Amino acid sequence: MKYFGTDGIRGIFGETLTDELAFKVGKALGEIVGEGRVIVGKDTRVSGDSLEAAISAGLTSMGVDVLLCGIIPTPAVALLTRITRSFGVVISASHNPPEYNGIKVLKGGYKIPDEMEAEIEERLENGSFPPRLVVGRTKSFREGRDMYIGAVLEIFRDLDLTGEMVSLDLANGATTTTAKEVFEFLGAKVEVFNDSQDGLLINQGCGATHPRFLAEEMKNGKVGFTFDGDGDRVIAVDEERNVVNGDRIIGILAVGLKEEGRLNSDTVVGTVMTNGGLEDFLKEKGIKLLRTKVGDKYVLEKMLESGANLGGERSGHIIILDRSTTGDGLITALELMRVLRRSGRNLSDFAKEIPDYPQITKNVRRTERMSLENENLRKIVEESTSRGYRVVIRPSGTEPVIRITVEGKDREEIEKIVEEISRVLES
């Protein structure tokens, strides 16, 4: 598709993502919605106000009422659309730098399917929108944040964090409006980093894509959680200041849920990027791993297809389907705390049980002449695979790059394979 990637529309504001495009997306979505309502939320980016106004103008011009939540995590908008059975729009570029922004469309708690994205694209390409006699209105819906916090607290009503020291890196993003309040309400003592709503600081050297920041800076926390800009990812830090990635979080949750009888079909969904160490660990515990394409929407599709209720990605996108319909960093963090409290164990003890095979990812800038249908490339992949290395080469769904990932047990050999593939792609 021309506009939609693996996580909605995304680009650098003022270049590939403009107010004009946002206005047209609003009109196209408005045609589909009819005379209903759309809940709109955003992260802290400076361009969020402008895009919010543009997409709202497009929606209201088509007779749709718009409920403005302000700064609020993506999973909060998902929950609100599920409760109200309505459409939602999130203005965010998730983990990307501040100059990026994006548009995600949700319906009834879920990101819309590819077919509906294609329908919006078709309307954008046609560019003709019949006038509506009825014009919609924009209304403040700041109580949406309180509804989300209330729902999360109800889910974890039996979780008592009294005496727990927790450190949070809020990435200067959307969880600045929710995470600290929830942890404190549950009794935890909270140390907070990067809680500014200055839109120029979001994800800058902090958050889920820079977990070492929290590992190096946390002072009092027995456990730490670092979120991304829109709050749908989380990475943990243990009491020894080791980073605990999404794969290991999934492994800990899988064992915890299985012990409670909550892990549907003893199955977990991951992606082609899921570390082989997690797969081996789960197999030892009698748990099956299903793999799918990269992207939390594809993880969710596979979960719904297989009946699994736990799935996610190494990046920290983790879906606990009996808790939430989408990846929710806050819910994942609280579920992990619940498993730890129930077991009486430290996070480091759990995490060390899960192997994490060396894995290197390199981004190569994508050019028009670059092709993955390359005989030399095929030979490298086949030869590497025959020696026990796992190779994944794929276009990014959110950035103009080709991602090369190689996994195995010999880091030096992995580095050689990655560089060899890079040379072939760039030649």
From Swiss-Prot:
Which cysteine residues pair off into disulfide bonds?
A: none
Task: Report residues binding Mg(2+).
Answer: S94, D228, D230, D232
**Essential cofactor(s):** Mg(2+)
Phosphoserine occurs at: S94
**GO MF term list:** magnesium ion binding; phosphoglucosamine mutase activity; phosphomannomutase activity
NCBIfam families registered for this protein in UniProt? glmM
In Swiss-Prot or TrEMBL terms, this protein is called Phosphoglucosamine mutase
Q: Which gene encodes it?
A: glmM
